[in-house]
């Protein structure tokens, strides 16, 4: 254990604030561009409004004072939380006022969730489809009903109260954001005190947060869900406060409650095994994880995080110092190792944000897979439309976060990187052999691209020539994903050894039986074959290209052979000035711009793979004799092995519903499908445009206005190159995502 000298410890964990550092001035805030001297002068050209949006949240450009930047970010976090609370409150309010939640609760297998009723202004009420239970509305696929049932909400009054609570929290967060910037603003050393921050985040936020949630799950969710599963009528289920205040109600369901806390203090914890379970698998009534397993998990997580929060050295001379951990972290081939990273992460919020976004984005994609492999909420697994939508949602959110990680890493390199601090450490060494990294990665991308695409081209050719025996397929030349099958197998078998007390395997997707709920498949083993091997290599190709673009942007953000002084040009610039041809699209920003297209590219294929695979091999109905009928009848293995198969049997075949939706409750998706294609096509006008073309056009239009004496005071300007690209990529992604939304929804709501 390390004992530290007192002089280095005296500044730890003292809450240090400045009083009233920045006056609250509505007059100042009302002036557009008040944060930037040149913007505050007002608009001379139309470029002003673009710069206003570009710089409003770019705190680095408002001031170079790290303390003030830190306070602005901290305060903005509270504002962000307030917005999230208002947003959640609005959704919960819809559930209370405009939904069929209680009808769904009493018959979740036959009633579909709806929380939006369209007003009949010019006939829009056609969108209010019959969702069962005598209710007409738009079917929602957000999974909120399943979440609310998991929470233990049994009536709409509870939803009203929760919605009001969300608004109260939003108000508190707004107040906190104002208070901690204008009244009591933390000093820089408070933001840089990483050990105290880790203690607070790990123990209080994650540890106590999980502990509090475990308490809710044990005292409210588990008993409520147990009664709902048993078919008890909603009006007969005790309310949450009754479970909490009347121990007898819980004792009836979980007898160990009668023993109170005695088993806890006598270390006889096994007595609590009736509500802290280790069942594994899914609840056969709801197709969701066991509520008591989830409670057990959150209790364990809480213990881990509370212990983790005690590891770091603050007021007392015991525990770890992050700086010491980093500076001692040297390997035989890493030079100075992690020396200097502490300075990077405590003086650059971009560096901090880049790592957080990369981790959180990766985690979000992992969550997408958990939602079908281990469905956490009751009746989620059999609501195929919701399953497809939350998978797609988490995949895309994860992609955006990862690209954001690369963006802020590049901004860190341009604005915050200090070569003096990073001498022969891991970051410096990576930068010094970046050519080897990028050229090898480029080779990998070319290899993967030609080989993965080549397998499909081979199959299309053989099928065109009528030679099925020569296809790469499960019935022709097999290319079985043997490593993936091996991993599935060991995960199916391992729990017998690693978790001998669990009653069921962790997830049915690795192997085991089919779980049906109400005649629909909730979970089943996902067998992998040649078709998955082929598409997996397309995934590998597109992900590697995305990484190539983003990593090149980060590693060459400060300099390159082409532009050695790139750091002086900033994070975003169109070209290296007039007179140097061939230097466009090299800025850090441009790599993010290009990376976004490949992110969208790669993740579209991921969600297409998931959608078709699940409809073909997992989702479907189960007859009384156990016969399973899948939605697309198992056509994935033979159709997904050719490009023509993807076009004909997936895109075209499954677009039937959206194309034929006019005149039905799904017609909005038909309009969206059309409109989003237009938005996507509109983006190309910005992406394939020349700035001079538009400037010439604008000047002739301004001439005409001058002739008529109606010339504008603010001079119109064509979009800059970067503005055009930003508008283009935004519409490209919006159009693409909304097209996919309409395509998926119309199809899965019809057949699912």
Curated annotation (Swiss-Prot):
Principal location class: membrane
Presence of the UniProt keyword Acyltransferase in the record: no
One annotated GO molecular function: magnesium ion binding
Gene Ontology annotations of biological process type: photosynthesis
Cellular compartment(s): Cellular thylakoid membrane
Positions that bind chlorophyll a: 685, 693
Top class in the EC scheme: oxidoreductase
Domain of life of the organism encoding this protein: Bacteria
Disulfide bonds: none
Residues spanning the membrane: 73-96, 159-182, 198-222, 294-312, 349-372, 388-414, 436-458, 533-551, 591-612, 666-688, 726-746
Binding site for chlorophyll a': 677
Alphabetical keyword list: 4Fe-4S, Chlorophyll, Chromophore, Electron transport, Iron, Iron-sulfur, Magnesium, Membrane, Metal-binding, Oxidoreductase, Photosynthesis, Photosystem I, Thylakoid, Transmembrane, Transmembrane helix, Transport
Family: Belongs to the PsaA/PsaB family.
UniProt subunit comment: The PsaA/B heterodimer binds the P700 chlorophyll special pair and subsequent electron acceptors. PSI consists of a core antenna complex that captures photons, and an electron transfer chain that converts photonic excitation into a charge separation. The cyanobacterial PSI reaction center is composed of one copy each of PsaA,B,C,D,E,F,I,J,K,L,M and X, and forms trimeric complexes.
Family matches, as NCBIfam families: psaA (TIGR01335)
Protein's recorded name: Photosystem I P700 chlorophyll a apoprotein A1
């Amino acid at each position: 254990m390390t004992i530290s000298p007192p002089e280095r410890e005296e500044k730890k964990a003292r809450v240090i604030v400045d009083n009233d550092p920045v006056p609250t001035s509505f007059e100042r805030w009302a002036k557009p561009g008040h944060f930037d001297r040149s913007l505050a002068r007002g608009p001379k050209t139309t470029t002003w409004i673009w710069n206003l949006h570009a710089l409003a949240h770019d705190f680095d450009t408002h001031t170079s004072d790290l303390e003030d930047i830190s306070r602005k970010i901290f305060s903005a976090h509270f504002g962000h939380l307030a917005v999230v609370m208002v947003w959640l409150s609005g959704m919960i309010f819809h559930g209370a006022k405009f939904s069929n939640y209680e009808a769904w609760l009493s018959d979740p297998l036959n009633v579909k969730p709806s929380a939006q009723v369209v007003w009949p202004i010019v006939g829009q009420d056609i969108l209010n489809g019959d969702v069962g239970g005598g209710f007409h509305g738009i079917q929602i696929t957000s999974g909120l009903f399943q979440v609310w049932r998991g929470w233990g909400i049994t009536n709409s009054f509870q939803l009203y109260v929760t919605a009001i609570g969300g608004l109260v929290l939003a108000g508190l967060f707004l107040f906190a954001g104002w208070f901690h910037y204008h009244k009591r603003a933390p000093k820089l050393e408070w933001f840089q005190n990483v050990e105290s921050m880790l203690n607070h985040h790990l123990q209080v936020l994650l540890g106590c947060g999980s502990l509090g949630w475990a308490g809710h799950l044990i005292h409210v969710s588990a008993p409520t869900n147990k009664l709902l599963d048993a078919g008890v009528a909603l009006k007969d289920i005790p309310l949450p406060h009754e479970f909490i205040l009347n121990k007898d109600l819980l004792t009836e369901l979980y007898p160990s409650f009668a023993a109170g806390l005695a088993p806890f203090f006598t270390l006889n914890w096994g007595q609590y095994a009736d509500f802290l379970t280790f069942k594994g698998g899914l609840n056969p009534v709801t197709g969701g994880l066991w509520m008591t397993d989830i409670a057990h998990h959150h209790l364990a997580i809480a213990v881990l995080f509370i212990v983790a929060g005690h590891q770091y050295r603050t007021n007392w001379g015991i525990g770890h110092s992050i700086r010491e951990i980093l500076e001692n972290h040297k390997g035989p081939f890493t030079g100075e190792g992690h020396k200097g990273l502490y300075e990077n992460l405590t003086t650059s919020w971009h560096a901090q944000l880049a790592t957080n976004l990369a981790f959180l984005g990766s985690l979000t994609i992992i969550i997408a897979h958990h939602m079908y492999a281990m469905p956490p909420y009751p009746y989620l697994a059999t609501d195929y439309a919701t399953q497809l939508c939350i998978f797609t949602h988490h995949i895309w959110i994860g992609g955006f976060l990862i690209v954001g990680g690369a963006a802020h890493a590049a901004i860190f390199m341009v604005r915050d990187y200090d070569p003096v601090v990073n001498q022969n450490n891991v970051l410096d060494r990576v930068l010094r052999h970046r050519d080897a990294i990028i050229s090898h990665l480029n080779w990998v991308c070319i290899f993967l691209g030609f080989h993965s695409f080549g397998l499909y081209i081979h199959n299309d050719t053989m099928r065109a020539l009528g030679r099925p025996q020569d296809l790469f397929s499960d019935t022709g030349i097999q290319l079985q994903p043997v490593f993936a099958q091996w991993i599935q197998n060991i995960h199916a078998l391992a729990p017998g050894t690693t978790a001998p007390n669990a009653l069921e395997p962790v997830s049915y997707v690795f192997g085991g039986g089919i779980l049906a709920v109400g005649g629909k498949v909730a979970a089943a083993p996902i067998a992998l074959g040649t078709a998955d091997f082929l598409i997996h290599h397309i995934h590998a190709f597109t992900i590697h290209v995305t990484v190539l673009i983003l990593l090149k942007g980060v590693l060459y953000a400060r300099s390159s052979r082409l532009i050695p002084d790139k750091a002086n040009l900033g994070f975003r610039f169109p070209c290296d000035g007039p007179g140097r041809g061939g230097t466009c699209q090299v800025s850090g920003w441009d790599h993010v711009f290009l990376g976004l297209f490949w992110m969208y590219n790669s993740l579209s294929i991921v969600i297409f793979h998931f959608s078709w695979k699940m409809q073909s091999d997992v989702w479907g109905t189960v007859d009384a004799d156990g016969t399973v009928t899948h939605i697309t009848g198992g056509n994935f293995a033979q159709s997904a092995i050719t490009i023509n198969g993807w076009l004909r049997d997936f895109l075209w075949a499954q677009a039937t519903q959206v194309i034929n939706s006019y005149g039905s409750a799904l017609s909005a998706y038909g309009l969206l499908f059309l409109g989003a294609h237009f938005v996507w096509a509109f983006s190309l006008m910005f992406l394939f445009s020349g700035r001079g073309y538009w400037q010439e056009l604008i000047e002739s239009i301004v001439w005409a206005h001058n002739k008529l004496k109606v010339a504008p005071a603010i001079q119109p300007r064509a979009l800059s190159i970067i503005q055009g690209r930003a508008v283009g990529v935004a519409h490209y992604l919006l159009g693409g995502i909304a097209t996919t939304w309409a395509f998926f929804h119309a199809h899965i709501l019809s057949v699912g």
